[in-house]
């Protein structure tokens, strides 16, 4: 799993869909946590241990191994601690054998022996053109890169390509869903030798590295997919100037930083420049974290970091302020939010609690119903609405009704012009997400099971167990986590296709009938 694991929407955080996740822990890690941990969940006690595992697509065995304070029955998880949910590069505790992929009705056939009587059982399927004297194998899950394989197996790229020629020197030919060779019979070159940054400097440099990295580096940071310069320098408490000096090819705007390489975050004999905070105006007593949104007011007392992909609506909804207040604190954001920059601090509260009044006056949906309706609204919205949601640009139907814990059917019944496929939903309007007197209960299917929506096209009608497909999740992760076969998964969700290439993200799939 990459740093991805994709960042949650701030709006989802408000609803406590799951705890905050990220490449650095917010809370103290539990004692004995794996030193290989590359992704964390900050546990606040609002979910069960099993829900934490499901939300992060982690099995209990791995979770307990990475977090020794967690018991084999998922006991021992405590609020106020950060727990590891990914440990990239950690050696497997049990040697992989050919019995791990038993013969089933899935597309993965029973392991067979290789030819030429070398006596080594070769798990199937394999990378095309793989050598016949292989004695060690690695399963390529979807999304895994050459760099991850050779780093984890401690082999060189040259050996990897030699043993798997069809992979090609640039790794463009590596397949997903196959076994590749990572060791051969009688080979003494199956372990990559670590290199030093410069002769006799005494520092071992992990590979691969960012091109043109300085030779006197003594501290390194692995760049997972999706990680930004700002996250690295903030976590390492170094300045952007030092980071670029030690990694020149990154460039001053960080556009040259590679993913899945080591970068330098400290050098021999150097005390790195630390990132200092400044005050917004001399004498106001408030420290302002940098960098900030251009034109931000000088009397700001509360700040919010704008991660890539975050919208205005997510910020002011999470901070419980209005769009008008947000724009008045950060004028260059503009009323349509087109001017908001990413990876800067924005102001979300003023000194002494000054709060500009909203410029969007409420009106009532109909005379006498007693509910004030914020304007503008989705055309055709029902007149007995009691709860509203502002639709920012780029927000989808699914994000709204999932956040509000209602069904698609309810959402469309409250806002008919949205249409069942959501093509009619307008941006920058208020939609209805709750009625006066409460919402009607969702309609159950004939089997008595309420089916969450939206669903994967082609899902069977007798499904009893469902799994939400977050962005970036693969079929392999789902079937491994749910302990089902690929054949059953495809049978219950015919729309995913036999090779799972048409599985939709942000839908529910069937994992039990």
Curated annotation (Swiss-Prot):
| One GO MF term attached to the UniProt entry | chitin binding
Signal peptide range equals 1-19
Phenotype when the gene is knocked out? Does not affect virulence on Arabidopsis, N.benthamiana and tomato.
In what ranges is there compositional bias, type Low complexity? 357-367
Which stretches make up the LysM domain? Answer: 38-85, 136-182, 219-265, 302-348, 387-433, 465-511
> Could you tell me which residues belong to the region Disordered?
357-377
UniProt keyword terms in alphabetical order:
Chitin-binding, Repeat, Signal, Virulence
Other facts: In plants, chitin acts as a microbe-associated molecular pattern (MAMP) that is recognized by lysin motif (LysM)-containing plant cell surface-localized pattern recognition receptors (PRRs) that activate a plethora of downstream immune responses.
What is the documented function of this protein?
Might have a role in sequestration of chitin oligosaccharides (breakdown products of fungal cell walls that are released during invasion and act as triggers of host immunity) to dampen host defense. Does not play an important role during host colonization.
Q: Quote the entry's note on domains.
A: The LysM (lysin motif) domains are small globular domains involved in binding chitin in eukaryotes. Vd6LysM contains 6 LysM domains.
Family to which the UniProt record says this protein belongs = Belongs to the secreted LysM effector family.
- Tell me the PANTHER family matching this sequence: AM15, LYSM DOMAIN-CONTAINING PROTEIN-RELATED
Q: What is this protein called?
A: Secreted LysM effector Vd6LysM
Question: What is the scientific name of the source organism?
Answer: Verticillium dahliae (strain VdLs.17 / ATCC MYA-4575 / FGSC 10137)
């Amino acid at each position: 799993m990459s740093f991805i694991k994709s960042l949650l929407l701030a709006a989802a955080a408000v609803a406590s869909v799951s705890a905050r996740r990220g490449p650095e822990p917010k809370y103290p890690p539990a004692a004995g946590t794996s030193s290989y941990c590359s992704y964390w969940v900050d546990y606040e006690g609002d979910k069960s241990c099993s829900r934490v595992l499901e939300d992060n697509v982690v099995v209990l065995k791995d979770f307990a191994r990475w977090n020794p304070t967690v018991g084999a029955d998922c006991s021992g998880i405590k609020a106020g601690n950060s727990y590891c949910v990914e440990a990239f590069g950690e050696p497997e505790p049990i040697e992989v054998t050919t019995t791990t992929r038993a013969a089933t009705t899935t597309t993965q056939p029973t392991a067979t022996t290789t030819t030429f009587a070398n006596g080594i059982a070769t798990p199937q399927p394999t990378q095309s053109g793989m050598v016949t004297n292989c004695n060690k194998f690695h399963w390529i899950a979807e999304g895994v890169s050459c760099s991850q394989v050779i780093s984890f197996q401690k082999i060189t790229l040259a050996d990897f390509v030699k043993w798997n020629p069809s992979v090609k020197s640039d790794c463009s030919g590596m397949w997903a869903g196959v076994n590749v060779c990572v060791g051969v019979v009688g080979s003494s070159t199956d372990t990559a030798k670590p290199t030093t940054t410069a002769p006799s400097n005494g520092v071992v440099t992990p590979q691969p590295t960012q091109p043109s990295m300085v030779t006197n580096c003594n501290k390194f940071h692995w760049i997972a997919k999706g990680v930004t310069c700002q996250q690295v320098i903030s976590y390492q408490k170094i300045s952007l100037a030092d980071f670029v000096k030690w990694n020149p090819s990154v460039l001053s705007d960080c556009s040259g930083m590679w993913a899945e390489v080591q970068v330098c975050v400290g050098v021999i004999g150097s005390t790195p420049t630390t990132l200092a905070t400044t005050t917004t105006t001399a004498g106001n007593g408030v420290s302002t974290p940098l960098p900030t949104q251009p034109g931000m007011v000088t009397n700001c007392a509360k700040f919010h970091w704008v991660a890539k992909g975050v919208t205005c609506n997510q910020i002011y909804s999470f901070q419980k302020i209005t769009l008008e207040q947000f724009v008045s604190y950060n004028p260059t954001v503009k009323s349509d939010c087109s001017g908001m920059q990413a990876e800067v601090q924005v102001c979300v509260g003023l000194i002494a609690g000054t709060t500009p009044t909203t410029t969007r006056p409420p009106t009532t949906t109909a005379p006498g119903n007693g509910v004030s309706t914020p304007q503008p609204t989705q055309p055709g919205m029902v007149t007995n609405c009691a709860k509203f949601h502002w639709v920012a640009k780029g927000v989808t139907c699914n994000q709204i009704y999932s956040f509000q814990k209602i069904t698609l059917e309810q959402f469309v019944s409250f806002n008919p012009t949205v249409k069942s496929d959501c093509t009619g939903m307008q941006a920058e309007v208020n939609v209805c997400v709750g009625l006066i007197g409460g919402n009607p209960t969702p309609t159950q299917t004939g089997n008595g099971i309420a089916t969450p929506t939206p669903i994967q096209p082609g899902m069977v009608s007798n499904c009893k167990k469902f799994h939400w497909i977050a962005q970036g999740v693969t079929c392999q992760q789902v079937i491994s986590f749910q302990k089902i076969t690929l054949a059953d998964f495809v049978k219950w969700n015919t729309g995913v296709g036999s090779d799972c290439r048409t599985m939709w993200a942000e839908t529910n799939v069937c994992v039990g009938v």
